[in-house]
């Protein structure tokens, strides 16, 4: 999301170097952010945008979010579906339409809170559906599609009675930005998370490790992605709650298995 907001300004490219470093003190506080791996620190305090994504650089994306400012980042979040409940097409057939609880990205945040939100921490809250829509938006060239519960209805002889038509909820970013995000998400797999790779298939992904709350040493392991990156057929979001593994290892194998199963059909 922060990477998309940066690319949309036209001032950043995948190889643009941004501030990183081994630690970053949240503005106006004594709280320091660090990175899980040394590659995320960059070199001489800087890292390319692509490598910041590939190595999950907390220090880089926290500083980037602050540099972009609350308006640009929160606006991108809203375009992607945050801060609004999401209705699911087809669910009204049950008599009670299914509406997903709204994900949340803070608005009018102070710089310290914006820095935390920019790495998925602090007051940021996201459902698996929301994060699946983010992955799908990149796969769809920047268009956020309305999720559907039923693809088609068939009669007893298997003929199609009705077919759900895809509907666009919003355009979050340009197709050019989507292409650059795809390149960066592929680097997540090729540079740092080879366990997510599928033979003969280009996989685009982003891992995440979210803290659950004060006093809880367990984490939520996340991964989102789509495949094939050059001709997307499936977008996935997986979260494994209350684990002690990074997202790549907790949620990654599940995403990989889902993709393999879907692409084998």
Q: What residue spans do the PLM features occupy?
A:
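Short, well-ordered alpha-helical segments
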Residues: 179, 249-256
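A short acidic/glycine-rich loop-to-helix N-cap element
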Residues: 240-252
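Intrinsic structural disorder
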Residues: 134, 192, 230, 244, ...
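Beta-lactam-recognizing serine transpeptidase/beta-lactamase-like catalytic domain environment
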Residues: 4-240
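Short, gly/Ser/Thr-rich active-site loops of penicillin-recognizing serine hydrolases
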Residues: 159-167, 253-265
């Amino acid at each position: 999301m922060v990477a998309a907001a940066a690319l949309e300004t036209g001032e950043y490219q995948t190889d643009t170097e941004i501030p990183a470093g081994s630690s970053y003190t949240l503005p106006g506080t004594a709280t320091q952010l660090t990175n899980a791996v040394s590659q995320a620190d960059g070199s001489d305090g800087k890292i390319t945008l692509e490598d910041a994504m590939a190595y999950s650089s907390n220090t880089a994306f926290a500083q980037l979010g602050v540099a972009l400012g609350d308006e640009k980042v929160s606006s991108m979040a809203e375009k992607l579906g945050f801060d609004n409940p999401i209705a699911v097409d087809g669910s009204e057939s049950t008599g009670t339409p299914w509406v997903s609880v709204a994900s949340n990205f803070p608005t009018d945040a102070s710089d310290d809170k914006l820095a935390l939100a920019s790495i998925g921490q602090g007051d940021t809250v996201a459902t698996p559906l929301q994060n699946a829509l983010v992955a799908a938006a990149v796969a769809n060239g920047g268009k956020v599609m309305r999720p559907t519960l039923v693809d088609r209805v068939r009669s007893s002889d298997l003929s199609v009675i009705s077919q759900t038509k895809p509907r666009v909820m919003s355009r979050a970013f340009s197709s050019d930005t989507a292409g650059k995000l795809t390149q960066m998400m592929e680097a997540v797999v090729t540079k740092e998370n080879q366990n997510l790779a599928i033979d003969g298939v280009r996989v685009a992904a982003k891992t995440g490790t979210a803290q659950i709350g004060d006093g809880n040493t367990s984490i939520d392991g996340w991964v989102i992605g789509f495949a094939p990156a050059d001709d997307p057929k499936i977008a996935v979001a997986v979260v494994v709650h209350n684990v002690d593994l990074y997202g790549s290892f907790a949620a990654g194998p599940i995403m990989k298995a889902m993709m393999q199963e879907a692409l084998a059909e």
